Design a protein with these regions (language model features):
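Catalytic-core regions of core metabolic enzymes
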Residues: 1-169
Length: 169
């Protein structure tokens, strides 16, 4: 519910079950959005700035697939080198932190977490029914896992462009 589909650019799969009119070229960046409408904008922006993606998944209300599931999948995906997340909430924060810490050692995770302001928290809650997490706890989770937190989608893609095209230390 509340999602807009998925996209996999692997030539062996080549699956597009989104509502997006266009999508970015094949590449090594995996993306996920908890917001369907924002997902379409993310795909369009990635196409405009020519960031190649390996896969894109819209999670919506996370009724079937969560960020935990996606991180586990992308951890073993040879087509994915960088992971981008747009999150409105965490389903199981401890499990998410444990998985993200491990995955982030091999593949950088860059995240935009909505709901930093009170208005943003209300919007996220009304959109997917997700409870907003406390900002202090969210910031601590990102620090402890080593994920890179960005404030805007533009910053998210700037970080992704750098990491997708430069060897990691």
């Amino acid at each position: 519910p509340n999602c807009m589909g998925m996209l996999n650019t692997d030539p062996a799969v080549n699956l597009d079950v989104t509502f997006a009119p266009n999508y970015p070229p094949r590449g090594n960046v995996a993306m996920s959005s908890q917001s369907g409408a924002l997902g379409i904008a993310i795909l369009d922006y990635a196409r405009q700035i020519d960031i190649g993606i390996s896969s894109f998944i819209s999670m919506g209300n996370k009724a079937d697939v969560s960020a935990n599931d996606l991180l586990l999948y992308w951890e073993g995906d040879p087509s994915t080198d960088v992971i981008l997340l747009y999150l409105e909430s965490f389903g199981h924060p401890r499990r998410f932190a444990r998985i993200a810490r491990r995955v982030n050692r091999k593949k950088p995770i860059v995240v935009v977490k909505s709901g930093r302001s009170q208005a943003g928290a209300r919007a996220a809650s009304s959109h997917t029914g997700a409870m907003a997490s406390g900002e202090t706890a969210v910031s601590a989770l990102f620090r402890q896992t080593g994920m890179i937190r960005t404030d805007t989608l533009e910053e998210l893609f700037e970080a992704a462009t750098l990491m997708a095209n430069q060897p990691l230390p």
